[in-house]
């Protein structure tokens, strides 16, 4: 099994993910969490790794705040687009770009990083535990992992609301090989277990798009966006809504020493 490379659909990826209210909402909720993490880590400038960072939307915003950001991605096209976007925003001096898969990034880093962003990648990799172990190895003790993954429970709920009963009964097989539908939707309980077994201390969990995708009237996603964002913000960090999110964002700390877990 190979990990997904988006060279063939980079433009479609950008348009479908970030050119919609679902992308706008995803970034808004994500940055609420990231702002809290940054506040807790203090005023110092951080070394940040965006592993599988794609076009760099989050990495560039981090660089605009003065942090030094390393972005790696398996897709050469995504790296090129990220470089162009960084130039346009005037933050190229705060960024480094590495063309490699997330699980290979350790060989490109000389010193550990303070914060790792690993967003919407875990659902595309064939060996998730290996990737998480690599990320552990390049994060300094006391550093933080920001992990966002595609939620298998959210996928099931979305299909049930749509009335796709046969598809759910068949186990929700992937319909096309080369699409934006993730290869490996993740069970959140399994992901939490992987993190805890590796030694991470989970700090917080947030459901991302806990209501947006389930609206009967799709025009409300756009026409009522501000009200929707307010309600998503109110409920997204409590159950059962966390587990209904289309994505789940987990923040986890690497202890100062593993024996403190």
From Swiss-Prot:
Source taxon at top rank: Bacteria
Residue stretches spanning the membrane: none
Top-level EC class: transferase
InterPro entries: Cmo5U_methylTrfase, Methyltranfer_dom, SAM-dependent_MTases_sf
Binding site for S-adenosyl-L-methionine: 26, 52-53, 73, 102-103, 119
One Pfam family named in its UniProt record: Methyltransf_31
Name of the molecule in the record: tRNA 5-carboxymethoxyuridine methyltransferase
Species of provenance: Escherichia coli O157:H7
